[in-house]
């Protein structure tokens, strides 16, 4: 008895007749019962760590890398040996986007602006030849908050009598995820909040101010002297990811 490759799992009955060679009419009939088992499936958990969401989709790996069907690497597509069945998507954090699993390729992707945190995707890996032969496992994606650099600034001197705006912006040496910090416009990646106002050198006189766009303004009539403003620069996606700096 031979079981060809690609035979679906199940019970097969083969009826055959055995006859005596010397007396060909002396025969008996029997049934050979063949049980074909489904292939063993190994769907192993996956963990992708130290991932940072960027401004474009970030492919972090493939869920099938450590999965096997009948001892062979699990593969998808026309000539593959497996399919990805039902997927339970990750739970959003703060209503933001979540990592995704592509059922056609097994690729795991972290979309732009995905909040920092741990995400779990559950998926089912099934044998292509026997679609009901499946195993489930989980993918864990640990997304880190991007690094914020908030550099201290020393503004060029401004005439306090007439006032004005220094040509240097407080955000000029600040960055998030190695990209320039932007607090305004259609796609800001950070927020700027003044933490400590400048202290007046004379009672009732104006002091320099700092806007949410990083612009320092010196009002006319500001007494000469050195002023310090402390501000906090925060990640627009992860509001608790912040750094302080001074102007």
What are these regions (language model features)?
Residues 1, 14, 32-36, 84, ...:
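Hydrophobic beta-strand residues in large extracellular and virion-surface proteins
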Residues 1-9, 107-116, 215-224:
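Extracellular/luminal low-complexity segments enriched in Ser/Thr/Pro
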Residues 10, 53-55, 117, 160, ...:
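Glycine-centered loop/turn motifs
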Residues 14-17, 22-74, 121-124, 128-185, ...:
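Extracellular interdomain linkers/hinges and stalk-like, low-complexity segments
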Residues 56-107, 164-217:
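Surface-exposed or secretory-pathway low-complexity segments enriched in glycine-proline
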Residues 91, 112, 147, 198, ...:
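N-terminal regions of proteins, emphasizing targeting and processing segments when present
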């Amino acid at each position: 008895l031979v079981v060809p490759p690609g035979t679906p799992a199940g019970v097969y009955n083969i009826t055959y007749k055995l006859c005596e060679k010397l007396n060909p009419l002396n025969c008996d009939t029997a049934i050979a019962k063949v049980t074909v088992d489904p292939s063993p499936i190994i769907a192993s958990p996956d963990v992708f760590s130290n991932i940072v969401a960027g401004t474009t989709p970030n492919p972090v790996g493939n869920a099938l890398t450590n999965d096997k069907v009948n001892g062979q690497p699990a593969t998808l597509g026309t000539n593959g040996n497996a399919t990805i069945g039902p997927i339970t998507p990750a739970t959003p954090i703060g209503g933001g986007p979540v990592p995704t699993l592509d059922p056609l390729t097994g690729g795991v992707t972290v979309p732009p602006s995905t909040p920092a945190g741990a995400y779990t995707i559950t998926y089912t890996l099934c044998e292509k030849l026997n679609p009901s032969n499946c195993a489930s496992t989980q993918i864990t994606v640990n997304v880190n908050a991007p690094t914020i650099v908030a550099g201290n600034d020393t503004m060029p001197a401004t005439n306090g009598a007439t006032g004005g705006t220094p040509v240097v912006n407080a955000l000029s040496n600040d960055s998030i995820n190695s990209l320039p910090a932007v607090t305004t416009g259609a796609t800001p990646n950070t927020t700027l909040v003044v933490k400590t106002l400048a202290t007046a050198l004379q009672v009732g006189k104006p002091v320099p101010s700092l806007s949410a766009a990083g612009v320092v303004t010196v009002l006319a009539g500001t007494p000469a002297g050195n002023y310090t403003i402390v501000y906090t620069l925060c990640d627009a996606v992860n509001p608790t990811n912040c750094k302080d700096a001074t102007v």
